[in-house]
Every structure is written in structure tokens, then in C-alpha cells.
């Protein structure tokens, strides 16, 4: 339990940030899921459109320390690679 005024304020700030970060993480996951769904369906055009939305969200999440930057880069790389495989078919 926070005893000092500054600790109580920090607790309130953490609670606010947690809500914002959860929201951003949920949006990011939804964007990635839409890319993965398009890839599973084999729809390259839909996958590219979804990727245009997902990549900035992943990088923004990394920039705001919601996920690690290497994690974001790895996810983007893997999704782009899967979309490229669709083009080869």
C-alpha cells in the first residue's frame, strides 16, 4: 500500500497507463489477427491492406514500450514473409 502522496499519485498514474496500454495492445493484436486471417484465406490483397494497418500499430506499440522493438520487428518480418509466400503461389 502506498504511504506517501507521491507514491499514491504514482499508483494512480500506473492505473491510467495500464488501461491505455491494454487498449493499444488489444488493437495491435486485432490488426495482426486480421492479417493472419487474410493469409489463411489466401487473399493476398486483403492481407496487404491489413498489413498496411498492422505494421504502424506494431511499431507504435514498440515505440511506446508496450512491446519490445525486436518483438515488433520480428512480427512484421514474419507477416511480410508469409504474404510474400502467397504471391509466389
Curated annotation (Swiss-Prot):
InterPro entries associated with the record: Ribosomal_bS20, Ribosomal_bS20_sf
Gene Ontology CC: one annotated term: small ribosomal subunit
Ribonucleoprotein as UniProt keyword: yes
Superkingdom of this protein's organism: Bacteria
Keyword Ribosomal protein annotated: yes
Keywords in alphabetical order: Ribonucleoprotein, Ribosomal protein, RNA-binding, rRNA-binding
GO BP of this protein: translation
Molecular function (Gene Ontology), one example: structural constituent of ribosome
NCBIfam families recorded: S20
Family: Belongs to the bacterial ribosomal protein bS20 family.
Cross-referenced HAMAP family: Ribosomal_bS20
Task of the protein: Binds directly to 16S ribosomal RNA.
Protein name: Small ribosomal subunit protein bS20
Organism: Bradyrhizobium sp. (strain ORS 278)
Amino acid at each position: 500500500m502506498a504511504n506517501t502522496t507521491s507514491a499514491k499519485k504514482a499508483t494512480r498514474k500506473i492505473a491510467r497507463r495500464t488501461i491505455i496500454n491494454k487498449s493499444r495492445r488489444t488493437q495491435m493484436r486485432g490488426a495482426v489477427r486480421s492479417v493472419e486471417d487474410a493469409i489463411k484465406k489466401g487473399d493476398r490483397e486483403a492481407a496487404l491492406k491489413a498489413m498496411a494497418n498492422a505494421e504502424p500499430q506494431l511499431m507504435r506499440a514498440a515505440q511506446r514500450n508496450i512491446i519490445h522493438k525486436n518483438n515488433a520487428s520480428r512480427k512484421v518480418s514474419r507477416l511480410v514473409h508469409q504474404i510474400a509466400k502467397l504471391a509466389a503461389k
